[in-house]
Amino acid sequence: MPKYRSATTTHGRNMAGARALWRATGMTDADFGKPIIAVVNSFTQFVPGHVHLRDLGKLVAEQIEAAGGVAKEFNTIAVDDGIAMGHGGMLYSLPSRELIADSVEYMVNAHCADAMVCISNCDKITPGMLMASLRLNIPVIFVSGGPMEAGKTKLSDQIIKLDLVDAMIQGADPKVSDSQSDQVERSACPTCGSCSGMFTANSMNCLTEALGLSQPGNGSLLATHADRKQLFLNAGKRIVELTKRYYEQNDESALPRNIASKAAFENAMTLDIAMGGSTNTVLHLLAAAQEAEIDFTMSDIDKLSRKVPQLCKVAPSTQKYHMEDVHRAGGVIGILGELDRAGLLNRDVKNVLGLTLPQTLEQYDVMLTQDDSVKNMFRAGPAGIRTTQAFSQDCRWDSLDDDRANGCIRSLEHAYSKEGGLAVLYGNFAENGCIVKTAGVDDSILKFTGPAKVYESQDDAVEAILGGKVVAGDVVVIRYEGPKGGPGMQEMLYPTSFLKSMGLGKACALITDGRFSGGTSGLSIGHVSPEAASGGSIGLIEDGDLIAIDIPNRGIQLQVSDAELAARREAQEARGDKAWTPKNRERQVSFALRAYASLATSADKGAVRDKSKLGG
């Protein structure tokens, strides 16, 4: 029988000092012996996806206390990728994932907490907390802040739905008037919550459902809707049950590594491909799998991508649907239901509610359930009122979207495409693979060949795009922006958005060892591995080299002879200490970022730290 971890600090005469300090936090004699549960919050006024979380930790804590536990809340940092985008702040985004994971480990282990409720939402916060949860392997439930409502504005006598990416594209489009750009900017992000499309934050919060670590509705129920409060109340009650099951009944099925198993990771990736999730999810799932000591690699993702169809299409891949529409169609469980009926899921998995996949679908799939309260929950919709308050409205759609032929979520028979929304490509400068979000690629450019325009920083590429130096047919290559080379593996949302602003969204490709925002669409290929700073062949590409992209056949090829590449590699190595570094780039890199770079691996490993350098 496992012993409560917290007993280390609450039991025995020699722990009198620790108990004295616990008493100073409000604990009493009656609390010593109860499970101490960490409420891991991420409230900040910097991030719209987290601005409403201040009081939600207290909400969870009250339920924990009522159920017989002791709740202790702490906060992690949270970076807003959209605000950090397009300048030096983006260097800090991905490294913040490791800091978040470490900070959770530090707090939980330093104070011997028995379990956790993780209140996350945006891009690196959910992955960081997920990595920590699987590293610590104590009972955990995730409950995120929820998606933002889609923006809406009237243009050309039509009401159109908007998001952050629309504001970026129109802000740089010379054909768009100042007044229209201003109107879009003011309308794009109307409420608190994670940005309203299938961007990284919402993708990851959906994936926690598929991994079994969050409750049905977590990924899609709007931040502003009153129904979302129930997820927080349930999490506080349920975590005490899970904690007691493990520590008092020796039930290891309550632990996250037994819930988020290899089969669950495969289901999560299957969901990701089917819903056209952010390419960043590949990075984060690979990293989380390593923390769980699960053998889940790019090879597994490649195999899944070849057999899973695209059953859901959401912004940025279309302007028709946002997360509020996914929820109306049944949310994550709705997509999982269609995947299950297509025979594409592992059914022998459980979630934090203790339900198997078939049981979850029977209870929560809108195409199967007889429970009117579940159907009512999935009718929760937007109010269209600007707010930063959680649970501030109770609007509902008149009906569910259960049209699996023409609706937001499709059945296998009516799939958007037989190919899924993500693909792994391999070739002579991406030997370990690279990732493309096929959901956002126009059919006309699934095969594309063009001359390279090479840039050794995102800034130079942006200047060239906006300066008209990139023309139709070009393949923009941005290198030395990987985990080590950046450092920090910047997102390339501005270059991809500005290609659209210049009318080149369907006429150019962009390839990088950096990564892309979940808001990116178009022929945007990232995570090229190995990265240039690690000696990857992307560092050998020269201006004018032809690059052939063949998504249907999963290929990407630099059309240069092996002999020429060998000669270029020899010349690169001859640069000595300057080898595999940018030739003409000035960038101030802090000590903290240099420390990150010294241990960073390439994207095919999840951009995690190289344990071999630490003797691990």
Curated annotation (Swiss-Prot):
Pathway annotation from the record: Amino-acid biosynthesis; L-isoleucine biosynthesis; L-isoleucine from 2-oxobutanoate: step 3/4; Amino-acid biosynthesis; L-valine biosynthesis; L-valine from pyruvate: step 3/4
Source organism phylogeny: Bacteria, Pseudomonadati, Pseudomonadota, Gammaproteobacteria, Enterobacterales
Function: Functions in the biosynthesis of branched-chain amino acids. Catalyzes the dehydration of (2R,3R)-2,3-dihydroxy-3-methylpentanoate (2,3-dihydroxy-3-methylvalerate) into 2-oxo-3-methylpentanoate (2-oxo-3-methylvalerate) and of (2R)-2,3-dihydroxy-3-methylbutanoate (2,3-dihydroxyisovalerate) into 2-oxo-3-methylbutanoate (2-oxoisovalerate), the penultimate precursor to L-isoleucine and L-valine, respectively.
Subunit structure as annotated in this protein's UniProt entry: Homodimer.
GO MF annotation terms: 2 iron, 2 sulfur cluster binding; dihydroxy-acid dehydratase activity; magnesium ion binding
Catalytic residues identified in the record: 517 (proton acceptor)
Designated gene of the protein: ilvD
Organism (species): Escherichia coli (strain SMS-3-5 / SECEC)
Alphabetical GO biological process terms: isoleucine biosynthetic process; L-valine biosynthetic process
UniProt protein name: Dihydroxy-acid dehydratase
Cofactor note: Binds 1 [2Fe-2S] cluster per subunit. This cluster acts as a Lewis acid cofactor.
InterPro entries according to UniProt: Dihydro-acid_dehy_C, DihydroxyA_deHydtase, DiOHA_6PGluconate_deHydtase_CS, ILV_EDD_C, ILV_EDD_N, IlvD/EDD_N
The protein's required cofactors: [2Fe-2S] cluster; Mg(2+)
Keywords: 2Fe-2S, Amino-acid biosynthesis, Branched-chain amino acid biosynthesis, Iron, Iron-sulfur, Lyase, Magnesium, Metal-binding
EC number: 4.2.1.9
